[in-house]
Amino acid sequence: MFASTLRKTFVFLGLATYSAAALTTTSNSTHYTISNSRFSVAVAKSNGHVVDANLDGQDLLGPLSGNSGKGPYLDCSCTPEGFWTPGAEPALVNGTDSTGTPYVGVIMTDTYETTNQTLSQYLFLRGEETGLHAFSRVTYYNESDYFLRGLGELRTLFRPNTNLWTHFSGSEGNYGPMPLSSTEKITVQDATTYLGDTTDDPYVSQYSDYFTKYTLTESWRDHDVHGHFSNGSTSGDGNTYGAWLVHNTRETYYGGPLHADLVVDGIVYNYIVSGHYGAPNPNLTHGFDRTFGPQYYHFNSGGPGTTLEELRADAAQYASPEWNAEFYDSIAKHIPNYVPSTGRTTFRGKVNLPKGAKKPIIVLSENEQDFQLNVFKKDSLQYWAEIDGSGAFTIPRVVKGTYRVTIYADEIFGWFIKDNVKVIGSNAHTFTWKEETAGKEIWRIGVPDKSSGEFLHGYAPDTSKPLQPEQYRIYWGKYDYPSDFPEGVNYHVGKSDPAKDLNYIHWSFFPSQGNHLRNEPYYQNVNNWTITFDLTASQLRNTKTATFTVQLAGTRNANGNSKWNPDPAKYNNLPWTVNVNGIYEDTWEIPYWRSGSCGVRSGVQCQNTEHKFVFDAGKLRKGRNEFVLSLPFNATSVETALLPNSLYVQVVSMEAVSVSNDMRVLVQAFMPLVTWGTAVEKRVLLTGIVSVSAMAKEDYPMISRPCPRKGGTRRRKKERKKEGKKQGRTVLDALLQRSEQDSFWSRFCRSPIESVAQYVYGQGSTALRKKTTDNLVRVVCVSDTHNTKPNLPDGDILIHAGDLTESGTKEELEKQIYWLDSQPHRYKIVIAGNHETFLDRNYHSHHGNERVTMDWKSLIYLENTSAILDLGAGHQLKVFGSPYTPKHGNGAFQYPRTDTTTWEEIPKDTDLLVTHGPPKAHLDLGHLGCRVLRQALWEMESRPLLHVFGHIHGGYGKEVVCWDLCQRAYEAIMDGESRWWNLCVLFYCWILRLFFDWTADGRATVLVNAATVGGVRDLKRREAICVDIQAGSKRFLSGCT
């Protein structure tokens, strides 16, 4: 149990008043002062914060007032209560590095006692340098509360309280004068103000009428330095000054080169971690220990005529990971987790690029993970470099290890992805990237450059102000969509201009919330975009398949910036629909974890994602063709701050292609980031992800819904699987983006007898007996949690039917065991699933690894074994568990579908049966269950009272089987046997069930598919399923979900 107050701790590593070469350290009762001949800082003994910084006699911070007038200092959004600014008495260290240069370090570590998490800040002054080298460390060790929360924000701030600083500089082309503190401000949305009434403010006259810190956001790819500039008009000596944050390393940031974040306003930021623009955050779980940095706060000065550009260039010379490498090696002993040069190497090589590739870049990042989401491993690192004209690249000082390589370039669709690339020595690597293509390109809109900046109000300069900032940087409400597109978007390929005729945001409606220029929302001609194009007969000749590919630069779903906690909102996953010539329609549900505030926060490059719409080329025609791209009408989100409530997407680019014979017609699209929604209900997918259903027809009154062609669903699944392999997605990604279950009408068009049989049989398959209160035993059933931890209701017996993990690692398994062990249920039964490769002896023998035993704590782990559960009063239940499923892919615990011996070990007196997979045709979407298992149950003399399984996520639910003629007929139909005759039998039995309770004599078995994290078109959130058993009679009673 931790105390309820903050504990201030420090390690005194060496404190003295000394002078080594040009460095001097002094102290008094309240401060330590560290200085060289030009630069000095004062550090408060009470909290370790820098409260004074002086360069050449000029005060850079001003007086201390709260959190102003100090820095760099550290804070975070990381505690259960929210933000925390740590502070503790610091320790000083000193020494001489390998070059003979002296240094002094200030180390502050503070512990948040109620959670036992720590923040540490390390600041070093070296020799005659006029700046501070900064590292930050976060730890969380707390076995009693394994998961604390996400690390929402972590940042260091240089926060002056002085009028010295006259200008901001975000990047080389984005700078301007600071707004005056006296300027009248009108709040127009969260963190955004209108200053235009004060026309003599230099910011207003030169840069913009609106101010928000998001205007000064920069993308990490080319970013080197940002900060404050003083033009000399406010300095004591008339000289110019600069305060800069230098990105000399970027390996410990997240999100790769596509990440963008705040850099400067009245504060010089170092945003180490944030959720801005949909960026993911790492989770603080027991054992989290990560050091970020180094970065370098540099302070410089020049004569009265020195320009901002000159001081900026002086700081930018340090933006190299090779700068000061010897120094960082020397102080590594003071910096936990920092890897010195002995553990680093140079990653170099050559890329054979597709023709036409511009601005190619190579990225090293967390293995087997999209670099935009590289927060899952606490030691995740990232590096990137531009690829030159010859295809060569060099990345110095890479920590040795195994990485994912990602390559992308302007003008080229898709990505090159290769996992398990070992960076150990300095050997050259060679990669060959072939552009994705499905045939001959018909048309292209936009440039695939990972941003929506080329469209209206994107990168084009705002010529109304002398400094001409890019339009997207300015408050979005300035650009009135109804005025720009009074008739909506109607874009004709070959005639329209992308810079004028497509907006940088595709709204579901144009909002008035957060828009001080409009009192009412505008709905007309907003959510549907129309793209028209002409085709000739020769372009269509001998074509079979068309593919329309869309790449998004960002999307705003109802989930907002939340990544791992799906919101139960209607448009959590955002549907984007393409209608082709009014005769074909397909919907892409944009997953919630790609959502973020992008366009409304002055962004054109956020979470990139893409999708291919594949359809029959026969839907295209000679002459005029029309695509309608639709967001649901009036799709909204709930906003707790003053922000627009309209959902949107922003498109990167689009392309259309056709091919002959058996090859496909490819239509690829890259457009501005836009989002759309539709009538949706929630359902839980892998890792607790909430998804949505297909849109209801009434949401799109002008779009018809044709009966799909036979085989269309299989074809789309195949294409999406193929796409996932090309892009190096994880199994999780593929599952999350797989096709939805079709509607009853769609299934009826494809297989009328089977669909009718499913409907009729389903009407009577969930009836349960009325509940009594005598000797009740509650069984709580879950399965396929895949690292998630759903809320579990109270009960007597907890059953987990496998797939506890996603990747099958020991670390993942231990976390799930820890979670299940903490549950209060008397008995906790667990089996493995096909994801638990760590537990499968055969899997390890085939892959050259050795299986290690697990500590199951209070859990009863069954692997083709039984256990007796003593319920008291002479009542017992026998439970048998098996992890095995029919062969499918390369998972664990699999057997050939032709094997008839697997289920012979089930004891005849089994009361509770737990298998990972279902018997075929029962709670078995896609008919992937086991026919042999089903037959084994038929042959048992005394069938189980309860059978719990998972594996088939879309089959979630419960069913009562009575082992009767009705069930025989239904199963025969599902197996394709005498379908018409068995359908008649099924109707006959269904009529009888209207009048008789077929479960009254206890012959029935309750089947439960408890897959909590998914389901193809099952539209309810996955909770545990409960079944009550009357212990004395061993009869099931009504249950709960």
UniProtKB/Swiss-Prot annotation:
Residues 707-720 have a biased composition (Basic residues). It comes from Emericella nidulans (strain FGSC A4 / ATCC 38163 / CBS 112.46 / NRRL 194 / M139). Belongs to the polysaccharide lyase 4 family. Glycans are attached at N28, N94, N116, N142, N231, N283, N528, N634, N864. This is Probable rhamnogalacturonate lyase C. Keywords: Carbohydrate metabolism, Cell wall biogenesis/degradation, Glycoprotein, Lyase, Polysaccharide degradation, Secreted, Signal. SUPFAM superfamilies: Galactose mutarotase-like, Galactose-binding domain-like, Metallo-dependent phosphatases, Starch-binding domain-like. Residues 703-728 are annotated as: Disordered. InterPro entries: Calcineurin-like_PHP_ApaH, Carb-bd-like_fold, Gal_mutarotase_sf_dom, Galactose-bd-like_sf, GH-type_carb-bd, Metallo-depent_PP-like, RG-lyase_II, RG-lyase_III. One of its GO terms (cellular component) is extracellular region. Pectinolytic enzymes consist of four classes of enzymes: pectin lyase, polygalacturonase, pectin methylesterase and rhamnogalacturonase. Degrades the rhamnogalacturonan I (RG-I) backbone of pectin. Residues 1-21 form the signal peptide. The keyword Secreted applies. CDD domains: MPP_239FB (cd07379), RGL4_M (cd10316), RGL4_N (cd10320).
